[in-house]
A protein has these predicted regions:
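A short acidic, Gly/Pro-enriched loop at the edge of an enzyme's catalytic core
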Residues: 171-184
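Conserved catalytic loop of SAM-dependent methyltransferase domains
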Residues: 263-295
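Short alpha-helix
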Residues: 245-261
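Short, glycine-/aromatic-enriched active-site segment of Class I SAM-dependent methyltransferases
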Residues: 219-244
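Class I SAM-dependent methyltransferase SAM/SAH-binding core
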Residues: 120, 128-172
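Conserved alpha-helix/loop element of class I SAM-dependent methyltransferases that forms part
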Residues: 97-115
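A short glycine-rich, Lys/Arg-flanked "PGG" loop and its adjoining helix->strand segment in the class I
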Residues: 197-212
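N-terminal auxiliary segments of SAM/dcSAM-dependent transferases
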Residues: 4-76
């Protein structure tokens, strides 16, 4: 299990970033929750069966989203999710980080890459996943991300080609030539898609014939009932905790793939509940520590 992207130095840097955060960035971060996670779009199984159109996430290119990630990636680096995603549970006895590594090995296999192939990550964060995929496959990594601070961190990584990582928005045209990439993947940024048809068509355009597009993200399953207050509240709490945007029935996802021209090879549901619980417990401990520091006036309240 050699791949360990988050080092003590990374965590120290994240802590320093949080302790020195500007009032402007702090205020923008706190305000973003009220802007981004209220009345987020949902399409359920019942909607699908009635033929209700898929409704995209309207703030997918917003300044508020960038403000959120400018701060939250520091918080995640303190924990186990510097890579900004909760992996599906592959081995419940192992940590979040180990499950990330196991899951990324699965993704690397699904991408069917050879050494020297070009692979793009949508919503690449600081490039930690891209580094691992490149290590596993020998492919040349590329990445786009909405938050400039995370791209700057990717640029500082000597294991990543700086010129291949850029501030970018998958809700707009991808800055790649037609048929120029061997594979594209996205690990949990896709709930911010504003127009599914546009984004999936853009990915299809930049892929070579036979290229692969792999995504992992949140999806509503058959049992979700929006009329059930308990279920609705649980989803909203999870949305705010894991900062996902839209919540769409999985068959909408499958249809979007096909409509863009893809052949759907596999669609698999994998839960992440146990790992989310582990990470919540870790952040509860951090919260207690930060409250103590604030009480002692070491950090601002």
């Amino acid at each position: 299990m050699r791949h360990k992207p988050t080092t003590p130095l990374d965590r120290l840097g994240a802590l320093r970033g949080l302790l020195t955060i500007s009032d402007e960035d702090s205020t923008a971060y706190l305000r973003s929750y009220g802007e981004l996670f209220v009345d987020s779009p949902e399409n359920t199984k019942a909607d699908y069966e009635r033929g209700v159109p898929l409704r995209g996430y309207p703030q997918g290119s917003s300044n508020e989203l960038a403000a959120l990630y400018k701060v939250i990636h520091l918080l995640c680096t303190l924990g186990s999710v510097e890579k900004m995603y909760m992996p599906p549970t592959i081995d419940p006895e192992q940590s979040v980080l180990v499950n990330q590594i196991l899951f990324e090995r699965m993704v690397a296999k699904d991408l069917r890459l050879s050494p020297g192939d070009k692979v793009l990550e949508l919503g690449c964060g600081c490039g930690a996943i891209a580094e691992h995929i490149a290590e596993l496959t020998g492919a040349t990594p590329y990445g786009v991300n909405l938050d400039p601070s995370q791209i700057q961190k990717a640029w500082r990584n000597p294991n990543l080609p700086r010129a291949n990582f850029a501030v970018g928005d998958f809700n707009k045209a991808l800055e790649f030539d037609d048929s120029s990439l061997d594979a594209v993947y996205a690990i949990q940024p896709m709930t911010y898609v504003s127009d599914h048809a546009h984004t999936f068509s853009e990915v299809f355009r930049v892929l070579k014939p036979g290229g692969v597009f792999v995504i992992n993200d949140v999806a509503a399953l058959d049992a979700y009932d929006r009329a059930d207050e308990h279920q609705r509240t649980l989803i909203q709490h999870t949305r705010e905790l894991t900062v996902f945007g839209g919540f769409w029935y999985y068959r909408y996802w499958e249809d979007v793939y096909r409509a863009a021209g893809f052949e759907l090879v596999s669609s698999v549901g994998r839960p992440a509940v146990e790992l989310i619980r582990k990470e919540v417990a870790l952040f509860d401990r951090y919260e207690s520590a930060f409250r103590l520091l604030a009480k002692l006036h070491v950090i601002p309240k």
